[in-house]
From Swiss-Prot:
Required co-factors: [4Fe-4S] cluster
Gene3D superfamilies xrefs: NadA-like
Species: Chlorobium phaeobacteroides (strain DSM 266 / SMG 266 / 2430)
Reaction catalysed by this enzyme: iminosuccinate + dihydroxyacetone phosphate = quinolinate + phosphate + 2 H2O + H(+)
UniProt EC number: 2.5.1.72
Recorded GO CC terms: cytosol
Name by which UniProt lists this protein: Quinolinate synthase
UniProt: [4Fe-4S] cluster binding residues: 101, 187, 280
EC class name: transferase
Pathway assigned in UniProt: Cofactor biosynthesis; NAD(+) biosynthesis; quinolinate from iminoaspartate: step 1/1
Keywords: 4Fe-4S, Cytoplasm, Iron, Iron-sulfur, Metal-binding, Pyridine nucleotide biosynthesis, Transferase
Length: 323
């Protein structure tokens, strides 16, 4: 097992081209009064040109509180859509409109509406990794950073529908000791980590602490020294005395972990050989070339119909208030 090397290696010619594009993006940001928001799972060269790099909660807050005229969102579709819901009067751009989220897509609006109708008295809390249509059916939205905090504020006698991620929901149920009605969606990246492979990595690296995202399966979480959101995992690696970590989440975060703690070792958790999908290919669809082109063309633009936007905004605002 080897540590993650920083960053993804490029040739001298590729680095020069990236540097030239980064310079052009910087000029366009000034001309357009634009802010570039990027998720930790995007490529290092995207993170390097972003004004804000963060997890879903940090990026939602950054989308809410900025003075830019244009928001360029390097992430997946629901993130840019959320930024547009919060900022209806701003131009919101996305480098690749087809960078979707299979977790969000695993919750079809018709099926979820029927699920909700079967439990009319339930409070509906949905993960931010969901479509605007699903948010419009929800009472509160949450992220992996604040889900536990929000659910602790709900009276225990109140029935909760939680979706679409069953693993995050199951983790919260176990931690808080309360039942919830779970939608059976999952993130394919985190679902790819399996107990046998994780334990093998721990045996090969006995000095390393296993840290894991709560979207992982319970069979992985039970072995983790620390469980937390992407931001919480990052913060933990900075403050923890350990010098080596096996990281069970999308490996894009290892770039920032290594940048903040250059003397520490970060090992990307191994994936199940029969399910080799522990990298989010949708996040990696955001390239520097696409970022530059979308700013130059002012397209593709995120558009959310106003009637849908108003309904989807309510649970987002509730989340930000409760956080």
């Amino acid at each position: 097992m080897t540590s993650y090397s920083l960053p993804f290696k490029s040739s001298g010619k590729e680095m020069a081209a990236s540097g030239e594009l980064a310079g052009k993006i910087g000029l366009l940001k000034k001309e357009m009064n634009a802010i570039v928001l990027a998720h930790y799972y995007t490529l290092p060269e995207i993170q390097q040109v972003a004004d804000v790099v963060g997890d879903s909660l940090a990026l939602a807050r950054a989308a809410e509180k900025n003075s830019a005229d244009v928001i360029v969102f390097a992430g997946v579709y629901f993130m840019a859509e959320t930024a547009k819901i919060i900022n209806p009067d701003k131009l919101v751009l996305m480098p690749d409109l087809y960078a979707g989220c299979p977790l969000a897509d695993s919750c079809p609006v018709g099926e979820f509406r029927a699920f909700k109708q079967r439990h009319p008295d339930a409070l509906v809390i949905t993960y931010i990794n969901s479509t605007a249509e699903i948010k419009s059916l929800s009472d509160i939205t949450c992220t992996s950073s604040n889900a536990e905090h929000i659910i602790r504020q709900i009276p225990e006698e109140r029935t909760i529908i939680f979706g679409p991620d069953r693993n995050l929901g199951g983790y919260i149920m176990k931690k808080l000791g309360r039942e919830m009605l779970l939608w059976q969606g999952f993130c394919y990246v985190h679902e790819a980590f399996r107990e046998a492979c994780i334990l093998q990595a721990c045996r090969e690296n006995p000095q390393a602490e296993l840290i894991a995202h709560p979207e992982c399966r319970e069979e992985v979480l039970r072995h983790a020294a620390f469980i937390g959101s992407t931001q919480a995992l990052l913060d933990y690696t900075v403050s923890a005395p350990a010098s080596s970590f096996i990281v069970a989440t999308e490996p894009g975060i290892l770039y920032e972990m290594q940048r903040r703690s250059p003397k520490k070792q970060f090992i990307a958790a191994p994936k199940d050989p029969e399910n080799p999908r522990s990298v989010c290919k949708q996040m990696k669809q955001n390239t520097l070339e696409k970022l530059y082109q979308c700013m130059l063309d002012r397209s593709p633009e995120i558009i959310v119909p106003d009637d849908l936007r108003v309904l989807a905004l309510r649970p987002i605002k509730k989340m930000l208030e409760m956080s």
